[in-house]
Each structure stands twice: as structure tokens, then as C-alpha cells.
Amino acid sequence: MTTQLEQAWELAKQRFAAVGIDVEEALRQLDRLPVSMHCWQGDDVSGFENPEGSLTGGIQATGNYPGKARNASELRADLEQAMRLIPGPKRLNLHAIYLESDTPVSRDQIKPEHFKNWVEWAKANQLGLDFNPSCFSHPLSADGFTLSHADDRIRQFWIDHCKASRRVSAYFGEQLGTPSVMNIWIPDGMKDITVDRLAPRQRLLAALDEVISEKLNPAHHIDAVESKLFGIGAESYTVGSNEFYLGYATSRQTALCLDAGHFHPTEVISDKISAAMLYVPQLLLHVSRPVRWDSDHVVLLDDETQAIASEIVRHDLFDRVHIGLDFFDASINRIAAWVIGTRNMKKALLRALLEPTAELRKLEAAGDYTARLALLEEQKSLPWQAVWEMYCQRHDTPAGSEWLENVRTYEKEILSRRG
């Protein structure tokens, strides 16, 4: 007997075929686009180095929803629960503060061995890993400067931390057979009017050059750098601005990270992708949702998320763009946050793959902007949801909101016991 889902799928195939779209091919392409989930949603960016310490660096996780992960075992269990509810290929993005060691480890001394449990777990779950040095929430970042610090000793500490992090990243790539993208973000900046804006940037330039001086196998490791407009306590001046890092990535041919929340509220990173791709070899995207500032709300299936996905698909950037998520909401169930945000990113990618782009390009080239707008709007109403539900079924994940019951059961049986 044909199920309702299968009936909807057959009808959707016909509707999309009528506008020249092969839905089976769209699903094959969707399986080429892993989304890198960020570990820090699971514990509000606490990490395991000093989990009781305060979060610094001009970022905030607001809320106090019960059940956050308190150690690596709990975090991995929570991730597994979330990943079971998300269809298709996934990766995990780790920060250096999520190391595991029986004794304290200085950040400039981190080694691959401190992340071996993560690698074994990734192998067991068929995941790639990405990495980040953690240049915040540390006594030597307390005055707001790290890689651009005027004190040579402190600056060298952070240089050494980033160099050690690159070796960890390369270890991930070598062990897992897929390159690890290591993103450098620093909180460096000033609260008020800054007289010398040049010297910190000169120091940052030299520091970054030292960080990436060790040649690593690009099949194992990819360097990325990330700008930001401002942070809490660094409202007036950010050393690592967009112009600084675009210039750096272009001149050094590293990847450039574009974070959806790291620009002026009227700017969108979807418009920056095609411009940056002319100059840099690869892009890392941190898909987020800024609400009036870099608030890192859970990603929605909104216009900007869709526009980001459409840029990747329309310009066939599958092999040059790495899709990561960056949000942390402590006011709702953290597993649900992962599931909602990651499923929304994948839905946006699917909708982009179901767009009749070739026809739209023809209309645009012919100057028929009326038809272009009409078709763009009409295709939003095509039955993409039926295609999504079949994709979920094929990946043995819940198709609709029934995933929430899985989360509620896990919350009742596991999270509620954490206090």
C-alpha cells in the first residue's frame, strides 16, 4: 500500500519535473553538502578546561535551561541524540577548550593526544572534525588582546596556542581522511576611542604569519580567518576587521570565514560570498542569526539562510565553501537548538537545489525581470516539503515535528538527572 508520504513524493516529482528539476539528482547533491555542527551549543561555550569559569571575549550565552552537558561523555551523548534527528552528512566543529586530560594543560601545550577520544568518536560516527583555537576565557586574554597584544610574552603565548591548534587540526584530517577547517577568531579590540589603530594590526599580521609558517598537508588541514564588527567591551575598535582579514586571506590564500552575525545589522553575508570567492580559494561560513547584534540565535529557515544556501548552489561552490553553524542559546533545550538550526540549514540547501536556476538565468540575461521575480516567488510554493520528508525517510530520521518527542523523551530520561 502506498503511504501518504510516498504519494506526496510522487506528486512532488511531477511538479518539479514540470519546471525542469530532477528531484533525485537534487537529493544526491544534498548528500554532497555536509553541515558542520558546533559543539559549544551543548554546554554554552563552557568547555572542559575550566567549566566553572566565565565566558569572555565579548560574547554571551544567555539563559539557564536545565540539562547542559558537564563533561565530554555527556556532550558526545547529546550530540549523538541530535545527529540521529538530522538527515544527511554532518561534521563536528570543536574548540580547543574541549580537550580531555587528567591534568591541566596550558593552551600553548595542547596536543593531538588531548583530542584522541573525539577522533575515535568521530570515526565511529563517520564524521569529519573541524577545529578552532580558543583565544578567550583565559587570564592572558583578560585585557582584551591576544594575537595583537603589545606584550611580546602574551602575544607569543597565543601564537603558540594557534600553532599547536593547527597540529591538532592536521591530526584530525589525517586520521579521518577529510580536511579539518581550522578557524582563527580573536576578540582583540577596544571599548572606547582608539588612537593607534595601526600598531595592533601590524602585530596581528606578523603573528598570523608566524602561526601559519609551518607547512601542513592541505589534504589534512585548512586555515581560515574570521572578522568581526564589534563585541561586548570592544565596541569602538576591532583589530581583526573585515578589511583586515579579507586582505590577509587574499594575500596569503587562506580561507576566509564569514559569520552571519559579525557585520553591521544591515549587511548580509549572502551578498559577500560571490565577491570573496573572486579572491580567496575557499570560504568558511558561520551561519547564525543576529538579532540586533551578534546574538547567535538559533538559525531559522529565513530569507538570509535561504540566500546563503542559494549562493552556494547557484554558483556550484560545493568544493570551495565549508558550511558551519555558530549559535548558542541557553534559554531552550540545547539538543532541540542543534536540531532546529541544522535541519533549517539543510532545508535551505534542498530548496536551493530545487530551484529552476537555469531558467531564471535565461530570464535575467534577457532582461525579463518581471518573469524572473514571478518565477522566484512561484517556486517558493512548489512542494519541496514532500521532497524533504522523503530525504528524511531515506536517512532514517523523523520527517516532521515528531523529532521533538524524541528530544522530550531524552530530556526526561537523561537531561533531567543532570540538575
Curated annotation (Swiss-Prot):
Keywords: Cytoplasm, Isomerase, Manganese, Metal-binding, Rhamnose metabolism. The keyword DNA-binding does not apply. Its EC number is 5.3.1.14. Transmembrane segments: none annotated. One of its GO terms (biological process) is L-lyxose metabolic process. Binds 1 Mn(2+) ion per subunit. Its main location: cytoplasm. Catalyzes the interconversion of L-rhamnose and L-rhamnulose. Homotetramer. This is L-rhamnose isomerase. The lineage of its organism: Bacteria, Pseudomonadati, Pseudomonadota, Gammaproteobacteria, Enterobacterales. The gene is rhaA.
